[in-house]
Amino acid sequence: MKIVKHIPNTITSLNLLCGILGVIFTFQGELSIAFYLMIAASVCDFLDGFAARMLNAYSDMGKELDSLADLVSFGLLPSLMIHRRLIEGGVTDFWAYVPVIICIFSALRLAKFNVDDRQSENFLGLPTPACAMWCGSLIYAADRGVMSVAGLLNERYIMIIAPLVLAALLISEIPMFSMKFKKGSEYNRLRLCFLGVIAASAIAVLALKINWSYIILLTFTAYIALNLIRALFAIRFSRK
């Protein structure tokens, strides 16, 4: 087998490495560093698929390895980050362990993705990287002391309720668009619109001199909201 065929799996392994290191730093209470590693893992997660397409290096092993890496980086890591933040905030009872549901439902979501032929172009349910990045950016903002809006509606309750909502979205049948661009303006219109939302959010955050983590938080909040709105409209028009 040519060396180039191993490039996607090597990048996937870097994704896994970032996830493992993120878990270690979370145990040490270094949540900001853990978030940086989550971002690095998400970059690797994008690049391994891109490399596989460019090099035509798809393999069954690569597909399974990608899911295993994603479970650590985007399932286990965000669960532990929220758990650690709750413990640091004085929540030491049952509620501190609610976030582990993200890891469990991420595993279910990844297993479903691997056997579901309907998700070759778009997703059914919230992608694990989107879930993880939403959680990670929230934790980072809290850890760096840049929370606003009354502690983001009381950070503690958000970090208990959000995992339950996200877990439901992970295994839902709600169609969610991917960011794979293809030929044809009709196919790419929604993706370009979403990129416009990201750009507008970035400009607003930078203009208001708000911490950069809010760009990520707003981006994935917008992604979830936009897909939910699309699903509601689809249900409404299907009944007519």
Regions found by a protein language model. Give the residues of each.
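Short, amphipathic, aromatic/basic-enriched membrane-interface segments that mark the entry/exit
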Residues: 1-10, 61-67, 179-190
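Helix-coil boundary and interhelical linker segments in multi-pass alpha-helical membrane proteins
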Residues: 21-36, 76-97, 138-158, 206-213
